[in-house]
UniProtKB/Swiss-Prot annotation:
GO molecular-function term, one example from the UniProt record: identical protein binding
Highest rank taxon of the organism: Eukaryota
Gene name per UniProt: VAC8
Residues lipid-modified (N-myristoyl glycine): G2
SUPFAM superfamilies per UniProt: ARM repeat (SSF48371)
A single cellular component GO annotation: nuclear membrane
Protein name per Swiss-Prot or TrEMBL: Vacuolar protein 8
Species this protein is from: Candida glabrata (strain ATCC 2001 / BCRC 20586 / JCM 3761 / NBRC 0622 / NRRL Y-65 / CBS 138)
Biased composition (Polar residues): 550-561
Length: 582
């Protein structure tokens, strides 16, 4: 505390020049004693606080400086929740025009702003306005400490909107371009803290922060790079911001792609996350690939860092949504590492993104389909199908449903014994899992050359295909009923004597179909629909793959007209089946 003591002693030489009142002289004497024993005393109450406060309100500049220095040193060592009585004199000092006092007062306030309760009280007491004024000054040390204090204040959610609307964002943005690295770090850190809500992000964009953040991606300082990449990643969460970025920041993607090769792991991770968020939009999905993002991503998903793996697999998942990227992703060598990530049982999220990416790649070209099967993806998904979290099962079942849509894939799936996984998955209590598995199963019953796998799985595992058909027919859920009826219709039209025999001689299935016909007929009659007029099933596209029907039914649950259409479709299929059986 030598600085403060020295200041007190210097001031005593100027007594004749600088007036000191008796109570100020007493406060100086007491404070010098307190400072000698500072480790055992509480400077936030009682005598020490009273002595400091007396000096703050003095007209003597040296005494004010001494008080500011004392507050700075004490708060650096002892940080805890304090009262208004402590903050008030510091806020008074903050309004001083003296640079020494400004530096120390900002430092003291920033130290106390580490405490969560103090953060709220400082803002409530009007601390933002003097801090903003100090940021707009010319003294680098003052700027640095003022910005640092606002950075701390902005970590409390209650303060974020108040800061965003206080006028602080424009000077913070300006200071982010400072030539002084400490000021730049604090300013970009403060801007980052303002990106955690949509409203504040909008204020930040309107304050002109985005071009500054993008320009600072080229900074040589890893902390500044980290703050800027993270801030931009958060800003890119909002669709409106992504559109604005696409219009105004043509170099953003190339800069972020370059940062995926940063020596700093956290910069690398945040750059990848920023690209993932941007890749929510179609245009960015293409641009990231054009900018050379794939080689970086294929390396990152094979790294040893879980955050890097998660960020990169989430990014490639979004990029793989665009059909034009599918072949390029396969050619870049993503299939083997993606299949390997399916074993990443410590991270459900990584598994989900990996399966989702594989699903997007599965239904592209014949070349990609062939490589997909050769990669072992189907085998691995089958292994995980019954032994993974529901979220992963949902992605796997969706992948199977997509694969089963393509006629060229059906026999390969059957040969891979996919029915051993699909049939048990139809028992899932999760409708996405059971519905996707059932849709895949139904599609595998349609337009195939070899029905041996269907026949051998008729009553096993877990009651087999027969059990699935019965359960779904009796589910009282229109989408599931439709899947079962559609599967029965496909089997009835298989031209396979054994399959047809199994259908025709299963009284439970036939009775369920007849019951469904009666139920749907009654529904239509009650709705006033003329079944004979509208029920020309010969003209309907009932032989299309089942996913389109399934999706349509899922979407048509609110409108009475759509409900009637769904009932009519179910009725038509029952009539086709019964016509065949008769």
């Amino acid at each position: 505390m030598g600085g403060c003591c020295s200041c007190f002693r210097d001031s005593s030489d100027d007594v004749s020049v600088l007036p000191i009142t008796d109570n100020e002289r007493e406060a100086v004497t007491l404070l010098l004693g307190y400072l000698e024993d500072k480790d055992r005393l509480d400077f936030y109450s009682g005598g020490p606080l009273k002595a400091l406060t007396t000096l703050v309100y003095s007209d003597n500049l040296n005494l004010q400086r001494s008080a500011a220095l004392a507050f700075a040193e004490v708060t650096e060592k002892y940080v805890r929740q304090v009262s208004r009585d402590v903050l008030e004199p510091i806020l008074i000092l903050l309004q001083s025009q003296d640079p020494q006092i400004q530096v120390a007062a900002c430092a003291a306030l920033g130290n106390l702003a580490v405490n969560n309760e103090n953060k709220l009280l400082i803002v409530d007491m009007g601390g933002l306005e003097p801090l903003i004024n100090q940021m707009m000054g010319t003294n680098v040390e003052v700027q640095c400490n003022a910005v640092g204090c606002i950075t701390n204040l902005a970590t409390r959610d209650d303060n974020k909107h108040k800061i965003a609307t206080s006028g602080a964002l424009v000077p913070l943005t300006k200071l982010a371009k400072s030539k002084h690295i400490r000021v730049q770090r604090n300013a970009t850190g403060a801007l980052l803290n303002m990106t955690h809500s949509e409203e504040n992000r909008r204020e930040l964009v309107n304050a002109g922060a985005v071009p500054v953040l993008v320009s600072l991606l080229s900074s040589n300082d890893p902390d500044v790079q980290y703050y800027c990449t993270t801030a931009l990643s958060n800003i890119a969460v909002d669709e409106a911001n992504r559109k604005k970025l696409a219009q105004t920041e043509p170099r953003l993607v190339s800069k972020l792609v370059s940062l995926m090769d940063s020596p700093s792991s956290r910069v690398k991770c945040q750059a990848t996350l920023a690209l993932r968020n941007l890749a929510s939009d179609t245009s960015y999905q293409l641009e990231i690939v054009r900018a050379g993002g794939l080689p970086h991503l294929v390396n990152l998903i094979q790294s040893e860092s879980v955050p890097l793996i998660l960020a990169s697999v989430a990014c490639i998942r979004n990029i793989s949504i665009h059909p034009l990227n599918e072949g390029l992703i396969v050619d870049a060598g993503f299939l083997p590492p993606l299949v390997k990530l399916l074993d990443y049982r410590d991270s459900e999220e990584i598994q989900c993104h990996a399966v989702s990416t594989l699903r997007n790649l599965a239904a592209s070209s014949e070349k990609n389909r062939k490589e997909f099967f050769e990669s072992g993806a189907v085998k691995k998904c089958k292994e995980l199908a019954l032994d993974s979290p529901v979220s992963v099962q949902s992605e796997i079942s969706a992948c199977f449903a997509i694969l089963a849509l393509a006629d060229v894939s059906k026999q390969d799936l059957l040969d891979a014994d996919i029915l051993q996984a699909l049939i048990p998955m139809t028992f899932s209590t999760n409708q996405e899992v059971s519905g996707n598995a059932a849709a895949a199963l139904a599609n595998l019953c349609s337009r195939i050359d070899n029905y041996s796998k269907i026949i051998s799985s008729w009553d096993q595992p877990k009651e087999g295909i027969r059990g699935f058909l019965k359960r779904f027919l009796q589910s009282n859920y229109a989408t599931f009923e439709h899947i079962a009826l559609w599967a029965i219709l496909q089997l009835s039209e298989s031209h396979n004597d054994k399959v047809i025999y199994l259908i025709k001689n299963d009284k439970e299935i036939i009775n369920s179909v007849r019951k469904m016909a009666d139920v749907t007929y009654d529904r239509l009659q009650k709705s006033g629909v003329d079944v004979n007029k509208n029920g020309n099933s010969e003209e309907r596209g009932d032989n299309e793959d089942h996913q389109s029907n399934n999706d349509r039914n899922l979407a048509n649950s609110t409108s009475s007209d759509q409900y009637e259409d769904a009932s009519m479709e179910l009725y038509n299929i029952t009539q086709q089946i019964l016509q065949f059986l008769d």
